[in-house]
Amino acid sequence: MVKKVIENFNISQICDSGQCFRMTPIYKNSDHVPGEVRMKVIAFDRYLEIHQTGKDCVFNCSEEEFEEFWKVYFDLETDYSVYMSRINPNDKYLMNAAACGSGMRILRQDLWEMIVSFLISQQNNIPRIRKCIENICREYGEKKLNENGEEYFAFPKPEVLAELDEDALKACNLGYRSKYVVRSARSIVNGEVNLDEIREMPYKKAREELLKLFGVGVKVADCICLFALHHLQAFPVDTHIHQAMETHYKRGFPKRRYKGIEGVLQQYIFYYELNFSPGKM
């Protein structure tokens, strides 16, 4: 068990930010502490439970595992207040969005999992994406046990999904997106797209390579670049971001001013639009 006091880290905001789909709340009424948030996270085949009350965080893992893996995964070595300090104080909309999502972090997630997750995300919503991912993992992922003896499932490898026909994944509620996942898995297994090489590529080259995968468009490629490869200059534009741009940045978002951190600001905007924009309150 590792206890930390962490600034600009809110596990609930991260969970609801649309960047990760295997982070879910834990409800145990018998020992609930008022004001405490509990989450379970499955990442890179690992299982973690987090308890957070304000800035106080308890990570249910060893100090060694926290230092070597989870600190990196949650990007805890980065001072996000530096990013927020770069926001133009005259931009009241962006200032407000950052304040509402000040606990956001850009997670360092698995590349293959993000490819599948954002292929599934097209014309979809967060609860349904989570359910689809859960179905795939339960059906085709390796079963594992956490420290409490509870089972969870690893994310299935490309080699596993490449062997399926599209109808098999349709049974996991993927619908027409099934063909995207199966064909992308086959492209990776056949060596047409090399994930190890993509991990080493700069942003634009990585995006270009990801676009070779069936079903991957610019928005999906940018999501993968941001949430798996940590290319913070990636700026995915979905319907929420498009609406924000139309309303608040008619001349275009000032990417030059925010060069290198555009993706962080995109997450503040996305989270705000999803949870706090007029009509959401």
PLM region spans:
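HhH-family (HhH-GPD) DNA N-glycosylase catalytic core used in base-excision repair
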Residues: 1-281
